């Protein structure tokens, strides 16, 4: 079995591709040394903790998870052979034919190793990966993972959880692309970083719309440096991206040396769209897409699957789920406490689903009474508590090493996802989990990417910065007042109902429990039309209902955990979303 065979990086595709997903040998030991024997087979890229892996064991802090398989290099000769990992949780070392080729730290980000020098030329090469994951015992980003799952925290998962693949590339190859569209100027600037070991290279870029070449240009690249090409989009090919019209331009970028010798070619895409905040016709501040007010109406999405935890069963399952979200009338997903594989964002790009992207929370063990329970009860008092040095210990960022790790993770997140047009807002902190110096985080984000909105602190511990006045409200009457930032209800709802006939929770968790589909539907309609809709005229401009699917014990999803059923009446949900859109269109005039 070879799961998830699709090319894993749609925004930087090559023709050379060898997928290494499938059965690997594995062992869990107390040592970093290569094990004397193997415990069995694991199905990569599924974590050993999940059913889909075929293992069903939890990696404990201090243990090592070892992977091994043999592989043949991609077809062809010469050039370089690159080994790519979509994500490995948390820290790993990689050997090829007994030689260390590198490693990585950080459970949510891709990395690439050049393994050319370690290949033996026989067609049978040994690949060994050793992993440690100190879930709950470090400051690293971990999201909702815990070794004691329950309530709003879920089972830990470790090791390889995204696709592993090989590519054969030329000696002078493109290592990364930075693609920056400019909606107002109607341009796209392409920056390519190349390996360029043989001297300066020329860059070229071609833009196509519907298969028609609409722009092309050349640039130059000093050896090993960034080369840049800016292309202009003519008026007749100006197709802005939005949830209603998610148009994507095709982009091809290559390197050459001299007149004709081609070194490398990669395929990508981009969109022309612009995010801002501006007053509507009544002077109320709104989120704007392409200079027009937009109601962002969506769901909290935590990205867990019953058989694969972080890893979906198939690419088709991902596309089907996102299409169902769009068909219900939503246009937004808040990706909560997780970074998805690149193909998830690609499908959002194609379908026109806006994504608000959380930075994955980390820090030391949380004082939940301080950051969650007490704050929920005393929200008016706690909302503006300063996140300065005296509180860093209480907010789980007491050590400088922890704060430095967050800064690195933040930069890695922006760099990894900025290529996706669907990402409309960065969320550096959620409910104070691992929060410190939110104002500094906003500055760091804008230095890396000033084309998107920033929700400085989702929920509370608001420092007054960013673009969003961000509310979480599960317990109180909803009252919105005009603010100097645009108002978002970035979490609310969460009505639980464990639907009969589906995997039952160990203990039902949610924010109020319905007893039937009819009651769940009625409560959803009452909340949306009776409490939320009247606040639109007062400035409410984004909605994030909790949540898309059930997750473990948290059975407050619109869909069941197995994605086989929608829990409220689907027609009622569509009708509610249509009513919200109609009311918003009325109140902004």
Regions found by a protein language model. Name each.
Residues 1-347, 351-355, 424-425, 441-447, ...:
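Secreted/periplasmic carbohydrate-active enzymes, especially glycoside hydrolases
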Residues 332-577, 583-588:
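Substrate-binding/catalytic cleft of secreted carbohydrate-active enzymes
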């Amino acid at each position: 079995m070879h799961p998830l065979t699709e090319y894993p990086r749609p925004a930087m595709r090559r023709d050379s591709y060898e997928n290494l997903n499938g059965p690997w040998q594995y062992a869990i030991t107390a040592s970093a040394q290569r094990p004397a024997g193997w415990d069995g087979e694991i199905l990569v890229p599924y974590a050993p903790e999940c059913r889909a892996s075929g293992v069903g064991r939890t990696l404990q802090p201090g243990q090592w998870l070892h992977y091994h398989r043999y592989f043949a290099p991609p077809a062809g000769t010469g050039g370089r052979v690159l080994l790519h990992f979509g994500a490995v949780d948390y820290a790993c070392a990689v050997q090829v034919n007994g030689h260390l080729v590198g490693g990585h730290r950080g459970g949510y980000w891709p990395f690439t190793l050049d393994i050319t020098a370690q290949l033996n030329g026989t067609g049978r090469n040994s690949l060994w990966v050793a992993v440690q994951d100190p879930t709950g015992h470090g400051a690293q980003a971990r999201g909702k993972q815990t070794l004691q799952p329950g309530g709003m925290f879920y089972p830990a998962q470790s090791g390889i959880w995204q696709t592993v693949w090989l590519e054969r590339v030329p000696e002078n190859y493109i290592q990364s692309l930075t693609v920056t569209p400019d909606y107002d100027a109607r341009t796209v600037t392409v920056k390519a970083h190349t390996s360029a070991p043989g001297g300066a290279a020329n860059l070229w870029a071609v833009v196509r719309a519907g298969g028609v070449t609409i722009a092309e240009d050349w640039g130059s690249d000093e050896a090993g440096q960034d080369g840049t090409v800016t292309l202009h989009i003519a008026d007749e090919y100006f197709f802005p991206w939005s949830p209603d019209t998610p148009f994507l331009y095709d982009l091809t970028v290559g390197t050459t040396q001299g007149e004709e010798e081609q070194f490398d070619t990669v395929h990508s895409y981009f969109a022309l769209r612009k995010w801002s905040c501006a007053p509507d016709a009544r002077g109320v501040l709104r989120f704007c897409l392409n200079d027009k007010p937009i109601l962002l109406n969506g769901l909290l999405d935590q990205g867990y699957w019953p058989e694969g935890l972080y890893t979906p069963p198939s690419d088709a399952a991902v596309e089907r789920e996102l299409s169902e979200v769009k068909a219900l009338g939503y246009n937004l997903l808040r990706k909560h406490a997780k970074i998805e594989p690149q193909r998830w964002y690609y499908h959002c790009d194609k379908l026109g689903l806006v994504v608000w992207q959380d930075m994955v929370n980390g820090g030391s063990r949380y004082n939940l009474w301080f950051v969650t329970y007490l704050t929920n009860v005393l929200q008016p008092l706690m909302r503006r508590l300063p996140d300065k040095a005296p509180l860093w210990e209480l907010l789980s960022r007491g050590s400088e090493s922890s704060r430095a790790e967050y800064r690195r993770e933040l930069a890695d997140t922006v760099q990894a996802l900025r290529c996706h047009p669907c990402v409309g807002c960065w969320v550096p902190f959620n409910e104070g989990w691992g929060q410190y110096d939110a104002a500094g985080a906003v500055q760091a984000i804008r230095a890396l990417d000033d084309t998107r909105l920033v929700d400085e602190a989702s929920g509370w511990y608001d420092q007054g910065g960013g673009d969003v006045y961000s509310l979480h409200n599960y317990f109180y009457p909803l009252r919105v007042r005009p603010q100097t930032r645009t108002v978002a209800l970035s979490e609310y709802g969460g009505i639980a109902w464990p639907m009969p006939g589906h995997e039952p929770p160990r203990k039902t968790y949610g924010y109020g429990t319905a007893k039937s589909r009819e009651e769940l539907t009625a409560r959803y309609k009452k909340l949306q039309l009776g409490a939320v809709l009247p606040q639109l005229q007062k400035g409410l401009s984004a909605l994030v209902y909790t949540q898309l699917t059930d997750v473990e014990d948290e059975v407050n999803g619109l869909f069941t955990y197995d994605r086989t059923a929608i829990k409220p009446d689907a027609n009622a949900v569509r009708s509610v979303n249509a009513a919200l859109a109609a009311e918003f269109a009325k109140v902004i005039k």
